[in-house]
UniProtKB/Swiss-Prot annotation:
Disulfides per UniProt: none
Pfam short name (any one): Gal-bind_lectin
Listed GO biological process terms: apoptotic process
Name listed for the protein in its UniProt record: Placental protein 13-like
Species for this entry: Homo sapiens (Human)
Amino acid sequence: MSSLPVPYTLPVSLPVGSCVIITGTPILTFVKDPQLEVNFYTGMDEDSDIAFQFRLHFGHPAIMNSCVFGIWRYEEKCYYLPFEDGKPFELCIYVRHKEYKVMVNGQRIYNFAHRFPPASVKMLQVFRDISLTRVLISD
């Protein structure tokens, strides 16, 4: 399967009930501290507010947050992450009525309460130290 470009940016609409599915593989061993970052922007550029950010250094806790007018809000951390060094992963972010439900390799890892209405999300960006094989938005 061919790789997608990284960073990968996509205009999106994420109504309640939709799901973002991201598959890829870290390109560095966990010892070298590779990262993965997923941002849900409220506009079509990187200066827009961030409704939801999922960021992790593989092998360390994930950090989830939002950013309003350039000011980061309270970060929430998730310590249980079923990523494996050098192995492909599937990250699914489900848009629910009150939160984003984050799953990795079929296991729920966190629920992040909405800080912006889901309908405000206009652009998705996936980047950092990964070989990206798929980004899919499902209803």
